[in-house]
A protein has these predicted regions:
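Classical protein tyrosine phosphatase
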Residues: 49-59, 68, 154-159, 163, ...
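N-terminal membrane-proximal hinge/A-helix region immediately C-terminal to the signal-anchor transmembrane segment
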Residues: 1-80, 97, 119-124, 207, ...
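Cytochrome P450 heme-thiolate monooxygenase catalytic core
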Residues: 71-79, 112-278, 293
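Conserved cytochrome P450 K-helix E-x-x-R motif and the immediately C-terminal K′/meander segment
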Residues: 1-34, 217, 306-349, 369
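Cytochrome P450 heme-binding "Cys pocket" and the immediately downstream C-terminal segment
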Residues: 68, 288-290, 412-459, 465, ...
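Short, cationic low-complexity segments
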Residues: 477-486
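Cytochrome P450 heme-thiolate "Cys pocket" and heme-binding signature region
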Residues: 263, 268, 385-419, 445-450
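Conserved cytochrome P450 K-helix/beta-meander segment immediately N-terminal to the heme-binding cysteine loop
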Residues: 346, 360-390
Length: 486
């Protein structure tokens, strides 16, 4: 590890560095010269960027007792009032309480109960792609939102979408714009949150006030629907109904905690899996050879007469590799979710003060050529020979995409299951390819990614067509599920 810390004390320079078009890349390039640890100091705020998996493991995992808190992001926490999200709560009793309730429903032994819902929603996606393949992005958003709405609230989202899909998309879009630390000056100077919204230069307050409305609506509206259904006896099983029923007369869980738990699964699940599915569509479009290999595997294992289900998972290793490579190639949260130190520490001879914001540059970690040879390429086969990878110490499965230590994403098992069944289902009946213009010429995609806190490929056109008449018949057979769900 380099013994020199790269240091920026100028607020203007630091702000530009963090807010640049794709900050994870910028910080990766700085790290090539400066080393694995980059230190930025601005208006009394200490920020450390970790560009290597080793540094992240040493600090965020092995020293979790010190590095498991979260910094208060003033724009998000105080101005936009996203203080209900336990993902951003400081380490402490409130966070433990929220995480304990959440984990009860989403730990690795709990998620198999959601497999029927995941299969049903994967099939709904297949039908939607058949009706309007050009709207694939909308269908992916609806698919992700529908899954978490059913699990969290017992609400069935119509195949064309509904108000809750739109609400989640709008609210998450807002928080992603504000999600990169330093995008707003108030993150550096928290006292600015007290500036009146009408004051010159207080546009962030006016913007935050509008965004807060979407945040509150996402928190309150689904809850109100569930309460009405419970009162009328029409509510189906869900995280919300289970917790509300269990909370009657209990002092251990309050209504606010229940609302927060359901809303964070709704918020996170509705946005993160769609980002990885966009990477999948892009990867298959630009690498048809990988798509064909995966389709051949599905055909061999599943056959032509049915769609994949979870019993096929262990027999479809190449499909698994594609899921992992989608997560590695463009990690959902390139700069991770920031940690914060709760006491002073020393690492590799460097003093790290209490209250330092620690940003794990996951994108940079996945571009480490010593760990991921040909790291910038989309190559699912890098995960094929697990024994060889272990011997060479490279191509680790990218579990760190879900975070580190005590703050690792507790919904990761549901996310992995959802990605797998959706990707396997699409591969079984569709071919994703480059589109053609009116003259029949192939349209080459521009491979660009958004720079928000949750990153996805910038919207691109693609062709999504059934692989065969047999595949088309399988898609149409799922219409029976739609009728049963009504």
């Amino acid at each position: 590890m380099a013994k020199r810390l790269w240091y920026a004390s100028c607020i203007t320079f630091a702000h530009r560095l963090i807010s640049r078009s794709f900050p994870a890349l910028t910080l990766y390039l700085v790290g090539l010269d400066a080393g694995d640890i980059i230190y930025i100091h601005a208006f009394g705020n200490s920020v450390i960027i970790l560009n290597s998996a080793k540094a992240a493991d040493d600090l965020l995992d092995k020293r979790g007792a010190i590095y498991s808190s979260r910094p208060i992001r003033t724009m998000i926490h105080d101005v936009m009032r996203w203080n209900w999200s336990f993902a951003g709560m400081p380490y402490g009793n409130s966070w433990r309480k929220h995480r304990g309730v959440f984990q009860k429903h989403f730990h690795i032994r709990a998620t198999p109960r959601y497999e029927p819902i995941q299969i049903r929603e994967a099939h709904a996606l297949l039908r939607n792609l058949l009706r309007s393949p050009e709207n694939y992005y909308h269908h992916l958003r609806r698919n992700s939102a529908a899954l978490v709405m059913k699990i969290s609230y017992g609400h069935d989202v119509a195949e064309e979408g509904d108000v809750f899909v739109t609400l989640a998309e709008r609210a998450m879009s807002n928080v992603m714009k504000a999600g990169i630390f330093g995008t707003y000056l108030v993150d550096y100077i928290p006292m600015l949150k007290h500036v009146p919204h009408w004051f010159p230069g207080a546009g962030f307050k006016r913007q935050g006030r509008e965004w807060m409305k979407d945040s509150r609506a996402m928190l309150d509206k689904p809850y109100e629907v569930v309460k009405e259904q419970m009162d009328s006896g029409t509510a189906g099983p869900s995280v919300m109904t289970i917790e509300l029923e269990n909370s009657n007369g209990s002092k251990d869980v309050d209504i606010t905690t229940i609302k927060n738990i359901a809303a964070i699964s709704y918020a996170a699940g509705a946005d993160t899996t769609v980002s990885t599915m966009m990477v999948f569509f892009l990867g298959m479009m630009i690498h048809p050879e990988y798509q064909r290999k995966a389709q051949e595997e599905v055909d061999r294992v599943v056959g032509p007469d049915r769609l994949p289900d979870f019993s096929d998972r262990d027999q479809l290793p190449y499909v698994n590799n594609i899921v992992w490579e989608c997560l590695r190639w463009n990690p959902i949260v390139p700069l991770g979710v920031p940690h914060a130190t709760i006491q002073d520490d020393v690492y590799e001879g460097y003093w790290i003060p209490k209250g330092t914001t620690i940003i794990p540059n996951i994108w940079a970690m996945f571009r480490d050529e010593t760990k991921y040879p040909d790291a910038f390429a989309f190559k699912p086969e890098r995960f094929e020979d697990e024994k060889k990878n272990m011997e060479l110490g490279n191509n680790d499965l990218p579990h760190i995409v879900f975070g580190f230590g005590r703050r690792v994403c507790p919904g990761r098992w549901l996310a992995l299951d959802s990605l797998w069944i959706t990707i396997a289902s699409v591969l079984s009946v569709y071919t994703v390819s480059k589109p053609k213009d009116a003259n029949g010429a192939v349209i080459e995609p521009e491979i660009e990614f958004t720079s928000a806190a949750v990153s996805r490929p910038k919207t691109f056109k693609c062709s999504v067509v059934p692989r065969s008449e047999a595949a088309l018949a399988l898609i149409k057979q799922t219409e029976d599920e739609r009728e049963l769900a009504k």
